[in-house]
């Protein structure tokens, strides 16, 4: 495996800042993640996505015109904190409310949910749409327990397109939910992941 990093402990932060440095015309670093460096329409919905680092180009690579307005990035394979989510969402807010969308994982549900409560307390309308596309993680009778993996992209893109069109927060939520309802995926890995600084598995 090819490795491009300095200190393994600094890998997520260096990857984030490196991506921003390479794409200053599109991205801006904020505490906890990245937001668009370009202007969005005033009073439009901001779509904020996120999750653990290590699944590149997700999540920062999904920020830009026609995609998300911001991405929250936790540590490697770890949910971002509620403070990180709150910070990125505040920076991405255009005045039309915020849609938080992410894969259905316990840590993400907890932390994004807490951040949503803080945003609402600040007077910022905020809704959540979980991505639940992974058919291997739960049976059809337990759709709400399915994880979100590759289907993230479909849901994020649909929500972002609705926001770009000027739809309201409620309408963007409905578009995202419908995209999630229509999306299924099945992941296959040929070998295990390799963490920075760890020996190949």
List the model feature ranges, each with a label.
Residues 137-146, 156-201:
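Internal, active-site/partner-interface "lid" segment
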């Amino acid at each position: 495996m090819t490795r491009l990093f300095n200190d393994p402990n600094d890998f997520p932060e260096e990857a984030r800042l490196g991506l921003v440095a390479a794409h200053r015309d599109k991205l801006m670093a904020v505490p906890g993640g990245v937001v668009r460096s370009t202007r969005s329409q005033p009073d439009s919905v901001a779509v904020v996505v996120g999750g653990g680092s290590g699944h590149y180009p997700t999540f920062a690579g999904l920020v830009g015109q026609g995609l998300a307005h911001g991405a929250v990035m936790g540590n490697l394979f770890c949910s971002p904190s509620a403070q990180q989510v709150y910070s990125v969402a505040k920076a991405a807010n255009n005045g039309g409310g915020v849609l938080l969308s992410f894969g259905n994982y316990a840590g993400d549900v907890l932390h994004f949910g807490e951040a949503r409560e803080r945003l609402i307390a600040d007077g910022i309308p905020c809704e959540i749409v979980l991505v639940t596309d992974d058919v291997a993680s739960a049976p059809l009778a337990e759709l709400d327990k399915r994880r979100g993996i590759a289907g993230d992209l479909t849901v994020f893109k649909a929500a972002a397109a609705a926001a770009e069109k000027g739809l309201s927060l409620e309408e963007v939520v409905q578009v995202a939910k419908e995209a999630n309802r229509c999306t299924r995926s099945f992941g296959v890995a040929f070998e295990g992941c390799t963490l920075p600084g760890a020996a190949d598995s």
